[in-house]
Design a protein with these regions (language model features):
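Short, compositionally biased low-complexity segments
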Residues: 18-39, 204-218, 284-290
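Acidic/His- and Gly-rich active-site-bordering loop/insert found
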Residues: 78-104
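Bacterial Sec-dependent N-terminal signal peptides
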Residues: 1-22
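Conserved beta-strand scaffold positions in the cores of enzyme catalytic domains, especially
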Residues: 71, 85, 139, 188, ...
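Generic, well-ordered alpha-helical scaffold segments in large soluble proteins
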Residues: 61-64, 121, 179, 244, ...
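Active-site/substrate-binding loop(s) of hydrolase catalytic cores
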Residues: 94-104, 109-267, 272
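Short glycine- and acidic-rich boundary segments immediately preceding or forming the N-terminal edge
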Residues: 21-82
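Hard-cation-handling environments
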Residues: 257-357
Length: 357
């Protein structure tokens, strides 16, 4: 009986971890957008853009627009693949600087595809071209190449690169941190995808439940981050981004995660850990965010929807940066004086919270 129970539980666990939206769910709640995505992934019926395809894609754009886009290699992956960072803009000294990153977790393909779409459109679409004259933009479209090539969250040594921003034990993380530090962005956004089906949700409702949010916003609550950085995120960047999402019928929420403890499920809002990018770059005095798009485990289900969600957010952040550059820069200068004291211990608060699923 125990063995049978274990088999049943294992089957449920495996099904939840690897489940995708049914056709009925995706068509009703997460329909794809009818948009053109000119990235290599859409030249084939399955799979995602491979590293070699991405480099061909970037090389074609660099040949076509030699004065508007370039890239350089910032280091190598553990399997000896060169990691590119793409630069767009006129590189004016006084321009506001924006850095975007995707593919730090290799099984989150919409992050890379959306940034390739953004690079393409910044060069090809008239309504976006003006942004590159007002901003200096750096984009790392595929940060974890080895993981991405096999659609694994982890680097080839099994480590999570988004838990390595303090110890810097992986060569990819060292290269990424150094290149972003050299660029010194005013705004840093790391694009990810999250898993909508979780074991924690199995007992919710009659058939279990899934997360309904197309995207979640993560920005640091670390007490050593200048509070005005958090204020800029909440009051300057997110309102216009939410408006763009509302206009497309996309759902959003601040980032939350769940865990089991004492036979109860607890939800955590936000994050404070300097091991991950959102807090790490905020501690470096950049406006820092991490975008979580609903997508891990969905393969190419609602893929254009996921890509377009990331793309809309990136586009919104660029426009907001142009319109508020002086205010944001002066805020970051003021934040150089913070903190006078360093917090080394904190305690989480527990509170009642209504969550739609």
């Amino acid at each position: 009986m125990r063995f049978l129970t274990f088999i049943i539980f294992s089957f449920i666990f495996f099904s939840i971890i690897h489940s995708q939206d049914s056709k009925k769910i995706s068509e009703k709640y997460f329909p794809d957008f009818d948009i053109e995505v000119p990235t290599p992934a859409f030249n084939k019926k399955k799979g995602f853009t491979k590293y070699s395809e991405m480099m061909n894609f970037l090389n074609e754009l660099c040949e076509k627009y030699p004065n508007k886009v370039s890239y350089k290699y910032i280091g190598k992956s553990q399997k000896d693949k060169q990691i590119p960072i793409v630069y767009l803009g006129e590189n004016k000294v006084d321009n506001f600087k924006v850095c975007f990153m995707g593919g730090l977790h290799g099984n989150e393909p919409a992050s890379t595809e959306s940034l390739l779409l953004l690079i393409h459109n910044l060069l090809e679409v008239d309504s976006l071209k003006d942004l590159t004259s007002k901003l200096n933009i750096a984009i790392i479209p595929m940060a974890n190449i080895d993981g991405y090539e096999k659609q694994s969250r982890y680097a080839s040594n099994g480590q999570d690169l988004n838990r390595d921003h303090t110890k810097l034990t992986n060569q990819e993380t060292i290269a990424i941190k150094q290149s972003i530090s050299d660029f010194s962005p005013d705004l840093m956004v790391d694009f990810h995808e999250y898993k909508p089906y979780r074991v924690d949700f199995v007992n919710f409702g009659e058939y279990g439940t899934t997360s309904m949010y197309d995207c979640m916003f993560l920005y640091s609550g670390n007490l050593n981050v200048c509070p005005r950085i958090k204020s800029i995120v909440e009051n300057t960047y997110l309102p216009p981004a939410k408006l763009k999402l509302d206009n497309k019928g996309l759902r959003y929420h601040n980032y939350l995660s769940s865990k089991h403890k004492n036979n109860k499920i607890y939800f955590n809002l936000g994050s404070v850990s300097p091991r991950s990018s959102a807090t790490s770059f905020a501690l470096g005095n950049s406006i820092s965010m991490l975008m979580e798009i609903r997508g891990v485990g969905l393969n190419r289900t609602s893929f254009k929807r996921r890509i377009y969600t990331s793309y809309l957010l990136a586009y919104s952040f660029l426009n907001t940066s142009v319109g508020n550059s002086n205010h944001i820069k002066s805020t970051l200068e003021d934040c150089n004086k913070f903190p006078e004291e360093i917090t080394i211990k904190y305690k989480k608060e527990k509170s009642n919270y209504n969550l739609d699923m």
